[in-house]
Swiss-Prot record:
GO terms for molecular function: large ribosomal subunit rRNA binding; structural constituent of ribosome. The keyword Ribonucleoprotein applies. Gene3D superfamilies: Ribosomal protein L11, C-terminal domain (1.10.10.250), Ribosomal protein L11/L12, N-terminal domain (3.30.1550.10). It holds the Pfam family Ribosomal_L11. Forms part of the ribosomal stalk which helps the ribosome interact with GTP-bound translation factors. Coiled coil: none annotated. Part of the ribosomal stalk of the 50S ribosomal subunit. Interacts with L10 and the large rRNA to form the base of the stalk. L10 forms an elongated spine to which L12 dimers bind in a sequential fashion forming a multimeric L10(L12)X complex. Keywords: Methylation, Ribonucleoprotein, Ribosomal protein, RNA-binding, rRNA-binding. GO terms for biological process: translation. InterPro entries: Ribosomal_uL11, Ribosomal_uL11_bac-typ, Ribosomal_uL11_C, Ribosomal_uL11_C_sf, Ribosomal_uL11_CS, Ribosomal_uL11_N, Ribosomal_uL11_N_sf. Belongs to the universal ribosomal protein uL11 family. PROSITE patterns: RIBOSOMAL_L11. This is Large ribosomal subunit protein uL11.
Length: 141
């Protein structure tokens, strides 16, 4: 019989920089998970993606063992890196803070496709384009 999942924890951590300090320690500690084992495994899996925030979904089982799935970086992080800006606009309707080319948009959509709720690259591009528009980032051809 399969082990029973007692909790699912979702965190967004810097790639390769997980440590027992908050938010990791308290989130895992309350479920009795070995925090250092998680940190070492997470850092090993994400060391090649340094500089990105990588969301992780941790499944904790009855016997306090765990498994985790790393996701792709948030679209907003990928857009800010592509546009070369620090952060998105607070008032996106009034003006743009940067721009990205349609080819960059397609690359971001291809990266995010496994985590998005769509099957075609065109629909993924529309989702990412909407995120960019809300951040005040213009799309150029």
């Amino acid at each position: 019989m399969a082990k029973k999942v007692t909790a699912v924890i979702k965190l967004a951590l810097q790639a390769g920089k997980a440590n027992p300090a908050p938010p990791v320690g308290p989130a895992l500690g309350q479920h009795g998970v070995n925090i250092m084992a998680f940190c070492k495994e997470y850092n090993a899996r994400t060391q090649d993606k340094a500089g990105f925030v990588i969301p992780v979904e941790i499944s904790v089982f009855e016997d306090r063992s765990f498994t985790f799935i790393t996701k792709t970086p948030p679209a907003s992080v990928l857009i800010t890196k592509a546009a070369g800006i620090e952060k998105g606009s607070g008032e996106s309707a009034k003006g743009s803070v940067g721009s990205i080319k349609r080819s960059q948009l397609e690359e971001i959509a291809k990266t995010k496709l496994p985590d998005l709720n769509c099957t075609s690259i065109e629909s993924a591009m529309r989702i990412i384009e909407g995120t960019a528009r809300n951040m005040g980032v213009a799309i150029t051809d």
